[in-house]
Amino acid sequence: MTHPFATKQIPFFLTASAPCPYLPGRFERKVFTRIDIGEGPALNDALTHAGFRRSQGVLYRPACEACDACKSVRIDAEAFEWKRRWRKIAARNRDLHVSIDAQTATMEQFDLLSRYLDSRHGDGDMAGMSFGEYVMMVEEGAQRTHVTEYRDSDGVLRAAALTDVLKDGLSLIYSYFDPEWERRSPGAYMILDAVRQAELAGLPFVYLGYWVRQSRKMSYKAQYQPLQVLTPSGWQPHAELAYHDMEDEEDDFD
């Protein structure tokens, strides 16, 4: 399958069926295309707006035959509701130094990621990732991309978020943090800080990837309101749709 984009045809491919990582007993398929140098930033913008996610040099979205549980979501940063819980988390982490200067992978980031994966996702797909694979994760297919770093008062890296800058917002690709700092809710703080960064940059949205209402791992994203959900009719306010959501603790972005 191809689709016209600018002056060229963009080829799309379909993966084979595989077990769903979010809903037991279900199977997933994905449609994907590769990002080429040159038109990459514009393609990333257009397809993210259409519900795709970037992973290294690939843009993909679910194309499951009998399930549409994965919903692309984005926060309306301009109207974000800073409820008491969010204000407390922001205050708890206000001593952190935030930098958006890192555009390449570092061993310091990788060491932190390895500790995070060992603590929270020891049996996941990313377990045992090598430094070379991490470099590919950060740098391959990068489209106006940076690693937002969060350091304590001693300069120690405590959390990081791989972030794409789009025309209409920030897309949070993956986040990780020091497991010993979990009581500070660093995952939630990185989302809140992305909202702050988007506001400062005049960008209306923060893209969080896929929200899966039936998955306790992925349902937490509905806590960040106002949230918009991509539907067959376009982006719609989550609050106006007939969902009854579970709330769960923070996680990384998918």
UniProtKB/Swiss-Prot annotation:
Enzyme Commission number(s): 2.3.2.29
One Pfam family linked to the record: ATE_N
Biological classification of the source: Bacteria, Pseudomonadati, Pseudomonadota, Alphaproteobacteria, Maricaulales
Function per UniProt: Functions in the N-end rule pathway of protein degradation where it conjugates Leu from its aminoacyl-tRNA to the N-termini of proteins containing an N-terminal aspartate or glutamate.
Protein name (database record): Aspartate/glutamate leucyltransferase
HAMAP family (UniProt xref): Bpt
GO molecular function list: arginyl-tRNA--protein transferase activity; leucyl-tRNA--protein transferase activity
Entry's localization field: Cytoplasm
Keyword check for Cytoplasm: yes
Organism, scientific name: Maricaulis maris (strain MCS10) (Caulobacter maris)
Source organism superkingdom: Bacteria
Location (main, coarse): cytoplasm
Keywords for the protein's UniProt record, in alphabetical order: Acyltransferase, Cytoplasm, Transferase
Reaction catalysed by this enzyme: N-terminal L-glutamyl-[protein] + L-leucyl-tRNA(Leu) = N-terminal L-leucyl-L-glutamyl-[protein] + tRNA(Leu) + H(+); N-terminal L-aspartyl-[protein] + L-leucyl-tRNA(Leu) = N-terminal L-leucyl-L-aspartyl-[protein] + tRNA(Leu) + H(+)
Enzyme class of the recorded protein, top EC level: transferase
Family in the record: Belongs to the R-transferase family. Bpt subfamily.
GO biological process, one term: ubiquitin-dependent protein catabolic process via the N-end rule pathway
This protein's GO CC annotations: cytoplasm
